[in-house]
């Protein structure tokens, strides 16, 4: 190994609707906690996804990872599942999981991690709005 660690980023966008709701709670408690995000008719976001992959540069290719391969992986595992979908109704991943930005980021991480070579480290940054975003995993 050449010990030249580097990080590459791939940015993608997808649009999805969702509703934040805990079925164990009363309607009043859901509204108090989730506010407008608890709208029974759902609401949507134009998500910005940044996938960060780190590792060592391959001395044969000069790449960390071929970005076309990473792009195809994101399309297959994330965009095809979630783009222009109602996350609560149209996806298996959120049938029983509240589709908060935090949970969406963890699900995306798990989907990509399962298909990404173990030699790479992975981090997901998901923007729900221009000012609100989450990152997973995080260091303690």
Descriptions of predicted regions:
Residues 1-140:
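Charge-rich, low-complexity N-terminal segments
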């Amino acid at each position: 190994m050449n010990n030249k660690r580097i990080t590459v980023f791939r940015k993608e966008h997808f649009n999805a609707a969702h509703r934040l709701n805990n079925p164990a709670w009363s309607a009043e408690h859901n509204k108090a906690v989730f506010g407008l995000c608890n709208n029974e008719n759902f609401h949507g976001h134009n998500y910005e996804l940044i996938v960060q992959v780190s590792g060592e540069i391959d001395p044969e290719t000069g790449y960390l990872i071929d970005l076309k391969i990473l792009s195809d992986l994101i399309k297959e595992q994330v965009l095809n599942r979630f783009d222009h979908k109602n996350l609560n109704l149209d996806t298996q991943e959120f049938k029983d999981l509240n589709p908060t930005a935090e949970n969406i980021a963890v699900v995306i991480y798990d989907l990509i991690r399962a298909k990404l070579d173990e030699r790479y480290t992975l981090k997901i940054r998901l923007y729900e709005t221009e000012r609100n975003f989450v990152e997973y995993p995080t260091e303690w």
